[in-house]
């Protein structure tokens, strides 16, 4: 768990630092999607971490959360409502404490230890990867809205894997039949990340940044990604971690 948790913390700290000394007008700035502000987005992250800590420690079940909120949009509205009347510094402190609770709980687990999730149980390592992807996805919205530089990091490897690993679920959600897809990506610093069987007939190739933006649904533009095979072409249309 050490590697994924270190990268999760680094991703969170990077976004945190980008908001240090941000003027109030930045916090009121609307992000590109969802009709919410930067302040709302950090509140959504804090809300997500708060409930993630409760999930990991068994204080609440995913069934309880689904019964209370029903869907992701309603859940996020709960976070925005919780932050109403709070100052930006209060919200970012809320996020800091909540995310620390998640990391602490996950650090006590083995990588393969199971956490109850939407479609059953997932490994603790995968749960941490989802938290990293969520932080990065919301960070993209914030940094884009504030016209801040976005630098792709080697941490995209985790999100790249998650995008590939969730392809079967994305196909199922779209009502499509899935066949093996190999994903070959170029990461920062000339890294090469490959997921899937060597003999797969369907292959997606391109920059890791484009793939990650696609699977967190920050963009429906495949960018420089290319697809070989009908299933790979369909994967570019339906891929999404949150589907």
PLM feature segments, named:
Residues 199-243:
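C-terminal interaction segments
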Residues 2-35, 40-43:
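Basic, Lys/Arg-rich alpha-helical nucleic-acid-recognition elements, primarily the DNA-binding modules
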Residues 4-11, 41, 91-94, 98, ...:
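Amphipathic alpha-helix face/heptad-repeat signature
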Residues 1-3, 50-107, 149-150:
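Short, helix-capping/interhelical loops that line the mouth of catalytic, cofactor-
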Residues 27-69, 117-173, 211:
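Short, contiguous alpha-helical
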Residues 174-210:
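Glycine/small-residue-rich hydrophobic helix-like segments
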Residues 79-140, 144:
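Contiguous mid-protein beta-loop-alpha structural module that forms a pocket-lining wall or clamp
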Residues 12, 45, 49, 99, ...:
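Short amphipathic alpha-helical/adjacent loop interface patches that line ligand
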